[in-house]
């Protein structure tokens, strides 16, 4: 196929793109661009792709296109760079937790965790994800049951406090 022979040209999700554009009235023309793929979506498993679609939907829902948000942009860049070499599902959930905080709705408050019945282990994982520094190695093993509990909690949190019904809710719970 053309995609296999020539590649995507860098115009795909999760690609760092630098471009030159000109404006003619309401129309923009891109005259040149260079790209660097941070996370190759074509190499993700179905389960991993679902998790990253969740991240895309989260960004679309909580970060208006008209408003620039450098923190969110840098956070996504770090997360994609790390995900290219580490556990992609874990990286997607970590960046989801951190993006919610940047959007101004912190899922890690004690009151919310109690109200939505997050276990002590879930609270600890939430705190670890919330404060994770993308430049460091992840040292702590993550139990699958606690990971799934936290993923379900984030879905409930977004629905209740973000007032958004995510189309990709449950993405982190998929197993094949």
Predicted regions and their residues:
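Non-catalytic alpha-helical scaffolds and adjoining flexible linkers that form interface surfaces
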Residues: 1-176
């Amino acid at each position: 196929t053309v995609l296999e022979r020539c590649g995507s040209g860098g115009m795909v999700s999760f690609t760092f793109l630098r471009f030159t554009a000109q404006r003619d009235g309401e129309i923009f023309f891109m005259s040149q661009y260079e790209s660097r793929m941070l996370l190759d979506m074509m190499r993700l498993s179905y389960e991993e792709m679902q998790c990253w679609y969740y991240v895309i939907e989260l960004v679309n829902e909580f970060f208006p296109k008209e408003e620039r948000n450098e923190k969110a942009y840098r956070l996504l860049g770090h997360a994609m760079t790390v995900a290219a070499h580490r556990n992609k599902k874990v990286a997607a959930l970590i960046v989801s937790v951190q993006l919610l905080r940047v959007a101004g709705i912190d899922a890690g408050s004690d009151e919310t965790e109690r109200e939505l019945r997050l276990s002590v282990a879930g609270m600890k994982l939430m705190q670890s994800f919330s404060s994770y520094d993308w430049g460091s190695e992840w040292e702590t093993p993550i139990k699958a049951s606690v990971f799934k509990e936290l993923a379900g909690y984030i879905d409930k949190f977004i629905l209740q406090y973000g007032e958004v019904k995510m189309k990709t809710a449950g993405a982190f719970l998929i197993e094949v």
